[in-house]
Amino acid sequence: MTTSSFDNGTGNRNEPTLATDQTQPAQPLQSSHDTPAPRAAEASVSDASTPTPGGGRVPSWVRAVVRVIGSRDYVGVLIAIVALALVIGIAHPAFLRFSQLTDVLNQATFVAILACGMAMLLAMRELDLSVGSIYALTSVCAAILMKHGMNSWVAALIGIGVGAALGLTNGLIVQLFRLPSIVATLATLSIFRGLAYAISNGQQLLGPSLSDSFSVFAGGHFLGIPNTVYVMVALVAVLTGVLYYTPFGYRIRSIGSNPEAAAFSGIPVVRIRLLAFVLMGTLGGLGGVLSLGYFGAGDPNLGIGYELLAVAAAVIGGTSLMGGKATIVGAALGSILLAVVAAGLAYFSVPINWNSFATGAVILLAVILDSLLRRRRTNNSPRL
């Protein structure tokens, strides 16, 4: 879909689309002079439950929650979300209703899933511009399988597997031919989108019926909140743990900080790079099959521009384009900011021709605010 749409309380399932791209300043390089990288990673994981002065141990998940909540990397985007929501709510009080706020969260979910994977790639100085096409192709593939009588859950799992295979394809192209990922995935963007059009004949394909259990799950609610939001929250929690509390996440950040030093220290750079692309493709597949269950159709036009949305959300949330740093929570918050912008444009009846301009301007302001706040913290931090 090439135009932005937002549900103003009608209950219709509409797909949001915005597009932008931003940049962030480079982050300081990480260093590991005394401990080889793999051992340092293992140490960071094993230290997650260190003894406290009282003799007890702090569970690793508690330390993870404290670390995420205590982080200030994404305070700028959080302030922007609250400020924009208040501005819209003052002018249009209906926006602050619980049903509308949960709808904004749901609108953000599909981009947030992609943005989480994009943050992992950006952390190691890579990029996947084909993720929007993967999103569409996997939804079409799953819809075809369901159309031929396959169980919807099995078809959804196969669709996610297709996404993983497409991500692996991207990684192999980048690695085997030594191509910059932006060039390789720019090509596969067109290839995967073309496949989606070819196998669907350019038409929407009906997915599971509304009574199907997969459709009920993808389009259902629990405690008034869409199930897709719970999926996004769970994904953010898992990937945050992976990024900060596993050797895999440590190696991603190490490669992004200094690829040569990472390779010299024994990190399997090629394997980690391939796994990161597979993860990105898997998340593209997850988003695609969830959209199939939610919207009720596989559409080759789905996800157009989502690659730029995912990059923008990740960067707005605090992930560095220069590598070495990523925040999964920030990527999700960046997606929510984009959804709030889309809602504001709809509520203020901004002409469609001005949507891209207004969206880009708001995103730029959010990035500048976030950058200024982080620069101020850096200047105020003690020098060693």
Describe each PLM feature range.
Residues T2-I81, S257, F264-R271, A343-L384:
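Cytosolic-side transmembrane-helix boundaries in multi-pass membrane proteins
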Residues V77-G89, M118, R193, V231-V242, ...:
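Hydrophobic core segments of alpha-helical transmembrane domains in multi-pass membrane transport
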Residues A80-L96, M124, A196-S200, L205, ...:
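Structural signal for alpha-helical transmembrane segments and their membrane-water exit/capping regions
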Residues L84-H148, I173-L179, A314, G318-I328, ...:
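Single transmembrane alpha-helix segments in multi-pass membrane proteins
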Residues Q107, S152, S181, I225-M232, ...:
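Loop-to-transmembrane alpha-helix initiation sites
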Residues N151-G159, A164-N170, V174, H221-D299:
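Helix-loop-helix "hairpin" substructures at the membrane interface of multi-pass membrane proteins
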Residues S181-T246, I272-L275, Y294-G303, N379-L384:
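Transmembrane helix-bundle core of multi-pass membrane transporters
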Residues G284, Y294-T359:
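Transmembrane alpha-helical segments in multi-pass inner-membrane proteins
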